[in-house]
């Protein structure tokens, strides 16, 4: 089983993750996009990345926004898997939004 991080550990990790918020049992971030087409591209890219890491976020999708929520259900909170995926998502979305 994966170890749940303490609140202090999560907050320390989030110092290195711009825009991510700690919300008790999960972390979240909202990404702004240029338009609907870019929004869907971001969602599909996150889905592929998550599938490759076998760790699946909750996504909220609207016209020019994607909100990502990460938690590890089996641990009942945030784990290193969530932090790793958050970092990967940040890198991926940053690259997509450059174009």
Curated annotation (Swiss-Prot):
Pfam families in the record: Pterin_4a
EC number: 4.2.1.96
Domain of life of the organism encoding this protein: Bacteria
UniProt-listed GO biological process terms: tetrahydrobiopterin biosynthetic process
Reactions listed under catalytic activity: (4aS,6R)-4a-hydroxy-L-erythro-5,6,7,8-tetrahydrobiopterin = (6R)-L-erythro-6,7-dihydrobiopterin + H2O
Keyword Cytoplasm in record: no
Gene Ontology MF terms in the entry: 4-alpha-hydroxytetrahydrobiopterin dehydratase activity
Keywords: Lyase
The keyword Lyase is assigned to this record: yes
NCBIfam families registered for this protein in UniProt: PRK00823.1-2
Entry similarity comment: Belongs to the pterin-4-alpha-carbinolamine dehydratase family.
Protein name as catalogued: Putative pterin-4-alpha-carbinolamine dehydratase
Source species of the chain: Aquifex aeolicus (strain VF5)
Source taxonomy: Bacteria, Pseudomonadati, Aquificota, Aquificia, Aquificales
């Amino acid at each position: 089983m994966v170890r749940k991080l303490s609140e202090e550990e999560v907050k320390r990790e989030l110092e290195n993750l711009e825009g991510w918020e700690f919300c008790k049992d999960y972390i979240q971030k909202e990404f702004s996009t240029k338009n609907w087409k870019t929004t869907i591209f971001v969602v599909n890219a996150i889905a592929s990345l998550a599938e490759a890491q076998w760790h699946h976020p909750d996504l909220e999708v609207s016209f020019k926004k994607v909100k990502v929520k990460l938690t590890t259900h089996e641990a009942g909170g945030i784990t290193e898997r969530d932090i790793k995926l958050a970092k990967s998502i940040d890198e991926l979305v940053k690259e997509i939004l450059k174009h």
